[in-house]
Amino acid sequence: VKTLKVGVCLMAALMLCGCNPLMTASVRNLKSAVIGPDELDVSAAQVAEVKYPQIKLTTPSGSGVLALVREREDLQFWVASGKQVLLLRDGLAVRTIGLGVEGDLDGTRLADNAPFKRGLHQVADGFTSQRWIDLYKGQEVGLIVNSRFSRRATQTLQILDKEYTVLRVDERIDVPAIGLRATNHYWVDPLDGFILQSEQQLTTQLRVRIVQLTPDRRHLP
């Protein structure tokens, strides 16, 4: 069932890539792992030409634009091409396909008290939680991720040609089983907790930056 659902998303992505220069450029850039990162320039006019919500994704191997092609309750499927898929749940990256050179994030399960569902704008300073992740390479399943949240200052964030007032929330994560420690950053709408931009460590080798290019279009048309 999981394979079928992802397959439907990939077909939609191929149609997008075939008719939109920006999406085609995204495919090329995200495949640039051999030669290193290549930043993709995105304009507001290019984004406006695509009716689907879009994000800009930057990885250690490149950057590109992904389109939202499917929603299942709070789970969103963002796709760039036939080999790159990012699944977000309330702004948290929970699975990747074709993004990790040394292996992908294969799954994520959140604790009942995880603050992403109700919004990080409400998280208390020093709040702790857990989640469990599966890694594609190494067959590591159910690794515990301990996290501690810190509220930071309100900032002004510019996305394309617009400015947004956001609250920065940091998440210190610790995955003892693989010796991973890192700090994730989330820039959220202080009114409803929507994550406009984030930097997330997904595996030991895969750190991503996610920017919502269409904050006013959060769901499929």
Regions found by a protein language model. Give the residues of each.
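Bacterial N-terminal signal peptides that target proteins for export
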Residues: V1-C9
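C-terminal motif of bacterial Sec signal peptides marking the signal peptidase cleavage site
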Residues: M15-G18
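Acidic, serine/threonine-rich low-complexity disordered tracts
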Residues: N20-G107, Q122-P221
